């Protein structure tokens, strides 16, 4: 189903050809939603840039375009505003027809893209032997939302988890565990993940303070890298232990990922160095192999190179990222690769992408994008920490959100003198708690830092998950009272728009298509959150001003259909955010 914007754009392009000739057929008519609804629903701004090109008055150009526009079935007569804006007001009859088509479409009018490319979304990426913390929250849920949106639009999406499963930390950990807990290197599940994290901290302390231990750890890394059977088995056990803990978090967040850690690319690292050398872009700097790039300098203004091989011959993150990028293009055949990491890595990825272009790993036909995000801060405005100053564990954060949601629900049940089963309370608390954490994050512009507040994210008013979930549950309650079988209405449906608030709701329901396409393009989930919040508010205004259950037919059924269409839109939008709806709260 073609969006309103696409329909209007096509009509304007036809009018431009009629008005000024075939050479104008691909000119963008600049059709957008009107900012001031007093002037109409949509606005075309093409007359202004065209007037400059043709050397005529913009209002004169606008009138010529209007004379050749064929919009009788879609809009009232177009008007010219200001210096030459073309204002368009949609007809109620057109809106009613569009809403009927939307209602009868299982995908709410959103078509899948044709000949969809393969897309890789690289997100989450925790480190082995460490617990997932609040820093992993944003990457995990932003990446999941982007992947869900692209999958819904028909793209083949490979969701990759680039876990940190290689490096000197394993030499430290294996060496330390051999001394204090050797069973952990030969038997599964003898350690809790928290114990493993503590052992890692102690190993790091020893590494920093004890030269002999440092040497032993380095030897352990060499043994691991050379494929020593005992070392590999110990490494595998440590990885498996962490994986199981990660999976518990992913299951709770309903996030699907395919693990392909740093170690996967080890066989390809030497080939990366060879390729860079063959291209003649490697330079030695203090014993390290580097690539110097334009536009990258340190604080002193000196050139800042990307180091791809350390002076001791070892590789680093840049080497692994280049190998991964090369593999994803050449082996996975990806045409679009999206990296979801914190904004602190923006410079790193800009360098990696530029080196990949210089080395001919990255052709112009492949789009690579770094999707940066800001910090999660506490209510004191500082980076979110525990009272003891440690990074907040993601598991603890989710548990606390669910506990808050449970208390809120129990207080509400008591106030309403309502009894519910323990299963109901557990399900609602878990759903609301996890949804609140997700929505609070996704509703912010990802580029910004945001303040983490349980009270704000669990509020039943405002741009929050509980508000959205309550709006959906309320509509389901209305539908149950309306006693209507939506599935068996067939072709005999009619949506009537009479009152201002139902016209506004109808118009807004038709903007979902454009919103999802905007998220596809901008990779900003907050655009979808803003749409859903505004939709909920418009529905509430409609319900307050337009009787539904007490109306006579055919208005009653029409308004129930608008209720159901709103519920379906909320459900779809929330599902793209990774949030499940509740039939009752």
From Swiss-Prot:
Short name of any one Pfam family annotated for the protein: DALR_1
Catalysed reactions, semicolon-separated: tRNA(Arg) + L-arginine + ATP = L-arginyl-tRNA(Arg) + AMP + diphosphate
The enzyme's E.C. designation: 6.1.1.19
Name of the protein in question: Arginine--tRNA ligase
Coiled-coil residue windows: none
Entry keyword annotation includes S-adenosyl-L-methionine: no
Molecular function per GO: arginine-tRNA ligase activity; ATP binding
Gene3D superfamilies: Arginyl tRNA synthetase N-terminal domain, HUPs, Isoleucyl-tRNA Synthetase, Domain 1
Keywords: Aminoacyl-tRNA synthetase, ATP-binding, Cytoplasm, Ligase, Nucleotide-binding, Protein biosynthesis
